[in-house]
A protein has these predicted regions:
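Short, Lys/Arg-enriched N-terminal segments with co-localized hydrophobic residues
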Residues: 3-21
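A short, charged helix-loop
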Residues: 172-178
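Nucleotide-activated donor-dependent transferases that construct or modify glycoconjugates
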Residues: 23-32
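Short acidic-aromatic active-site loops that bind/stabilize oxyanions
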Residues: 32-33, 83
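Short N-terminal binding/cap micro-motifs at the start of the first secondary-structure element
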Residues: 33-39
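A structure-centric signal for secondary-structure junctions around beta-strands
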Residues: 21-23, 37, 153
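Glycine-rich beta-alpha loop elements in corrinoid/cobalamin-binding modules
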Residues: 5-10, 39, 43-46, 50-172
Length: 178
């Protein structure tokens, strides 16, 4: 399945329509370079979307190198997998990438953020939302929301985010049985 976003070029450039695939980056910050984050691979496989990319980093890398790599990839949406060994590190990266790309939605998931999503969203104002639970179905549906393929956002389960007016929206959990 290939999904295209159609948009008009800025006036004066080219009035023809341009097709562009929305890029979604699933980023994992591992404890060591020999470790691999299976969650991001599971999310990508379930989403069945060629526009989803995976970026794997380690807590031993310089934050600036990770920020540079994320910036060079130019994702439209950034999703990060949070665990006890990388949460502080990811929070620092998120705050910096939020300054570099304030228009880019940033989503977090994983056991270290899903139990108290409201506090995470309060602490990290540049984060759009937190995915809860297993995540596969929720991630796929959030991708569809951003592509305007999902008619009723209220039907998506397993996340908490901030509405446009910064009020809280909490969806019910979802059974993500594969």
């Amino acid at each position: 399945m290939r999904i295209y976003l159609i948009g008009c070029m800025p006036e004066g450039k080219n009035s023809d329509l341009e097709e562009r695939i929305m890029k979604i980056l699933l980023a994992a910050v591992n404890a060591k370079y020999i470790h691999s984050n299976l969650a991001v691979y599971s999310l990508k496989a379930y989403a069945e979307d060629p526009a989803v990319e995976i970026g794997e980093y380690t807590i031993n890398q310089q934050k600036d190198d990770i920020l540079m790599d994320i910036y060079k990839r130019q994702p439209d949406i950034l999703c990060l997998s949070c665990y006890i060994w990388n949460l502080d590190y990811i929070e620092e990266i998120v705050l910096e990438i939020g300054k570099l790309r304030p228009d880019m939605p940033i989503w977090l998931g994983g056991p270290e953020v899903s139990y108290d999503a409201k506090e995470v969203l309060r602490r990290l104002p540049c984060v759009k939302g937190v995915m809860k639970g297993e995540g596969e179905k929720t991630f796929k549906e959030i991708c569809r929301i951003y592509r305007n393929e999902f008619e009723k956002r209220e039907n998506v389960c397993g996340y908490q985010d901030k509405n446009v007016d910064n009020s809280w929206k909490k969806s019910e959990s979802v059974d993500n049985q594969l």
